[in-house]
Amino acid sequence: MELEVPDEAESAEAGAVTAEAAWSAESGAAAGMTQKKAGLAEAPLVTGQPGPGHGKKLGHRGVDASGETTYKKTTSSTLKGAIQLGIGYTVGNLSSKPERDVLMQDFYVVESIFFPSEGSNLTPAHHFQDFRFKTYAPVAFRYFRELFGIRPDDYLYSLCNEPLIELSNPGASGSVFYVTSDDEFIIKTVMHKEAEFLQKLLPGYYMNLNQNPRTLLPKFYGLYCVQSGGKNIRVVVMNNVLPRVVKMHLKFDLKGSTYKRRASKKEKEKSLPTYKDLDFMQDMPEGLLLDSDTFGALVKTLQRDCLVLESFKIMDYSLLLGVHNIDQQERERQAEGAQSKADEKRPVAQKALYSTAMESIQGGAARGEAIETDDTMGGIPAVNGRGERLLLHIGIIDILQSYRFIKKLEHTWKALVHDGDTVSVHRPSFYAERFFKFMSSTVFRKSSSLKSSPSKKGRGALLAVKPLGPTAAFSASQIPSEREDVQYDLRGARSYPTLEDEGRPDLLPCTPPSFEEATTASIATTLSSTSLSIPERSPSDTSEQPRYRRRTQSSGQDGRPQEEPHAEDLQKITVQVEPVCGVGVVPKEEGAGVEVPPCGASAAASVEIDAASQASEPASQASDEEDAPSTDIYFPTDERSWVYSPLHYSARPASDGESDT
């Protein structure tokens, strides 16, 4: 394994994946560069004469003299060719190796292969400059692709068989984006710190996908590096959130922040601008209305994903939302006429599993409920405030931003000038809470008037909204929203009470612990469950008939063990209990058995309560109240512990000779 050449300073922040229509040769790249913000730094490139757009840079992305996009002074055509050559070799070589389980060391493996321009016995000849291609964690990423149903030949066909298409509206991150011709995958250039963070994230990402592959988080299919001319260009292959075959009428990048979260004037001049939080609140005050089942599944998925991101200390992520307006498209088709209908091609659905928005949030897979996604193209059915039918394509993006020192400084500086709770850069816990609250209460809302259609067998698992017809529409007053009565808590044990667990384990606990805390708790639980002789709870133990904690003192003058309440810091009451059956005291030491009188013995039980007022009431009055069950294990000072439950022992009638004391 060879050492990598250090990169030049990489200071540009990662931005949103803002994909729209297909890119068309150099003209698309030149047009995209003219729409950038006016304040971009200008620096001349090494080669070529200045031309239109020459010298404009955003991060490492620029334009050369011919108008072609460059990244780290490497032309886009050269980068695309190197990526396709490298992936074709590495994936093909890996497919010849036998499959095996993923090991811990597999997450840190880096394979490297040299591609000379004249070719070698392992690599083909090419007309690019010599380069070295590195593949990170090939075995681990092969497992991820298999988990999402992506076969090696399909992966190679999508990435290497057809030319990659550069997106003309890449956003403000300074990255270059490519999409495959079949709309399956997005290739994005990432910075050194982002690639390094993804490598550290892989073990936890592996655990996350194992527990729940249905997530709105990005699906990473590969991490690669092209090394040429002393430059390292790292790229990541991900799922495509916004398919090009579906026309997006609106596009939003939402974070739950309000500080400078409005699309700029230059952005709004684009053919498909990326709007932000304040734009959404202004243009869609009623939010996006979903039926009950869809809303519940979406909220549950968002809650789980936010807890995962918080546990990894990830922040500054966004929800990419693409809105396809069905009614608007039908009106556009009617205006254009039926002349183009005969030539229209029906779009092909994406092949990867869990890649669409509907598949990412579906919660009924365990019950076998599904719908056919041909009509929705994987979008989530919704209705806006005007009653227009929509299809939503959503995904969480830009998760490779950890809360590092520079982010802490950025938030501190912004908080001094503006309200600290409104800026987008924030600590991970607060960021997750604000993000989840904004999405579950402002962006998405539950509508009781939307009914679910009967389920069909297919790839999706949620129930779709019934078609309302091409001319059907509801007014905002006819579509009630249930936003005001329900508040959703990110860390609540059950934030959405109508959801069931579906037989799947939760991804993370309500309050995500650190790795050290989780390990310590696991060891402590194992030791306590294996070393303590604790009777199992019988089926007859219910909430109405629980077990209680009791403590015994040494025998009194009459030889009977005396039960007395012990002084504790907690508030307590003393309850007099007269059992009608015999109870045995089992001390911790083996062989030391003490017998309790069969009946009639007065016993004092110490029961902990929370209310301070009840602690001062008489014992006779407190004994009439319902006893509080004990849920923990108590170890008395005299090293005796026993559990009393009348249902655990056979009842024995009291003899006539026994009397109450």
Swiss-Prot record:
Compositionally biased tracts (Low complexity): 525-534, 605-622
Modified-residue entries (Phosphoserine), positions: S554, S645, S655, S659
Effect upon mutating S645F: Cannot rescue the effect PIP5K1C knockdown on EGF-stimulated cell migration. Decreased tailin assembly into focal adhesions
PTM annotation (N6-acetyllysine): residues: K265, K268
Xref: InterPro entries: PInositol-4-P-4/5-kinase_C_sf (IPR027483), PInositol-4-P-4/5-kinase_core (IPR002498), PInositol-4-P-5-kinase_N (IPR027484), PInositol-4/5-P-5/4-kinase (IPR023610)
Pfam families per record: PIP5K (PF01504)
Tissue specificity as recorded in UniProt: High expression in brain. Also detected in lung, thymus, heart, testicle, kidney and embryo. Highly expressed in forebrain, in particular in cerebellum, hippocampus and cerebral cortex.
One cellular-component annotation, GO: focal adhesion
Assembly and oligomerization: Isoform 1 interacts with TLN1. Interacts with TLN2; interaction stimulates 1-phosphatidylinositol-4-phosphate 5-kinase activity. May compete with beta-integrins for the same binding site on TLN1 and TLN2. Interacts with ARF6. Interacts with AP2B1. Isoform 1 interacts with AP2M1; phosphorylation of PIP5K1C by CSK disrupts the interaction; clathrin competes with PIP5K1C. Interacts with CDH1. Interacts with CSK. Interacts with PLCG1; interaction is abolished upon EGF stimulation.
Protein name: Phosphatidylinositol 4-phosphate 5-kinase type-1 gamma
